Amino acid sequence: MRYPGGNFVSGFHWEDSVGPKALRPARTDLAWRVIETNQFGLNEFADWSKKAGSEMMMAVNLGTRGPEDAKNLLEYCNFEGGTYYSDLRKSHGYAKPHDIKLWCLGNEMDGPWQMGHKTAYE
């Protein structure tokens, strides 16, 4: 199962989807023109994937973010500890890494409807 899915990922800030729910910001989702509450986030999806017996695929925002953000997300999800983002995950109650093996780079980035879309040449 992919998280987050679809056009939504092109404006997704994963940091908004972790930590105490009361502290998560609500943001405008430009892809679907709705409010994203971030009340079901990355860690909740990881929990759900395990309960469902499915393998999690993490999608990386390539629409409005880039490689540095992808590195931070990887560190949060897969590093054991001793780094800023892996220790942040631990402080959120997840001592062990999510160990995500499947990663999706953006979503339909060649489509002109996509935030941050690129042509094949670009």
Tell me the role of every PLM-derived stretch.
Residues N61, Q114-K118:
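Short, solvent-exposed loop/turn segments at secondary-structure boundaries
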Residues M1-V9, V60-G81:
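Carboxylate/His-rich catalytic cores and anion/metal-binding grooves
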Residues N7-L42, D47, G82-W113:
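Aromatic- and acidic-residue-enriched carbohydrate-binding clefts of CAZyme catalytic domains
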Residues E55:
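Residue-level detector of anion-binding/catalytic polar loops
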